Amino acid sequence: MALLGNEKIYLSEETYNKYKNEYTELVTVERPAVQASLKEARAQGDLSENAEYDAARDRQSEVERRILELERILENAEIIDTKSAVQNKAGIGATVRYLNMKTNKELVVTIMGPHDSNPIENKISNESPVAQAIMEANGIGDVVEVEVPQKYNIKVLDISYAK
């Protein structure tokens, strides 16, 4: 996931901790292990046809890329705080029941940041068209338009936040 500038990255506390632990593991365990592999491969002499050296360089690239990615995520992270959320107004962390007025079906979703979204668990990204529409609603009972190629309306039926 590409990050631009200093944009906020909304994360659940669980995901923040997972990324923080991954970062620590990469910096304290993986990076030194890769450096040791490179040193060992260099000691074998001719690097031009050294598969172990090439593999270690590839792994080093992967590790360093992921370290940089995690640094950007953690530096720009904002942990989702549902305790201070405005009740009856949907925001990140809200579980929302709504009616798709085109299909006449009720759906329940939880609005999360992109790193926590999981459609299988009905967790949608705050950047998705449905979440954007829900967050523009003034509250329960409001009807809003979902901005997709074939626009449709939804009605917010309930908004709740985990305690």
UniProtKB/Swiss-Prot annotation:
InterPro entries: GreA/GreB_C_sf, Tscrpt_elong_fac_GreA, Tscrpt_elong_fac_GreA/B, Tscrpt_elong_fac_GreA/B_C, Tscrpt_elong_fac_GreA/B_fam, Tscrpt_elong_fac_GreA/B_N, Tscrpt_elong_fac_GreA/B_N_sf. Gene3D superfamilies: Transcription elongation factor, GreA/GreB, C-terminal domain, Transcription elongation factor, GreA/GreB, N-terminal domain. SUPFAM superfamilies: FKBP-like, GreA transcript cleavage protein, N-terminal domain. GO terms for molecular function: DNA binding; RNA polymerase binding. Residues 49-80 form a coiled coil. One of its GO terms (biological process) is DNA-templated transcription elongation. Keywords: Coiled coil, DNA-binding, Transcription, Transcription regulation. It comes from the Bacteria. The keyword Transcription applies. Belongs to the GreA/GreB family. Necessary for efficient RNA polymerase transcription elongation past template-encoded arresting sites. The arresting sites in DNA have the property of trapping a certain fraction of elongating RNA polymerases that pass through, resulting in locked ternary complexes. Cleavage of the nascent transcript by cleavage factors such as GreA or GreB allows the resumption of elongation from the new 3'terminus. GreA releases sequences of 2 to 3 nucleotides. NCBIfam families: greA (TIGR01462), PRK00226.1-4 (NF001263). This is Transcription elongation factor GreA. It comes from Mycoplasmopsis agalactiae (strain NCTC 10123 / CIP 59.7 / PG2).
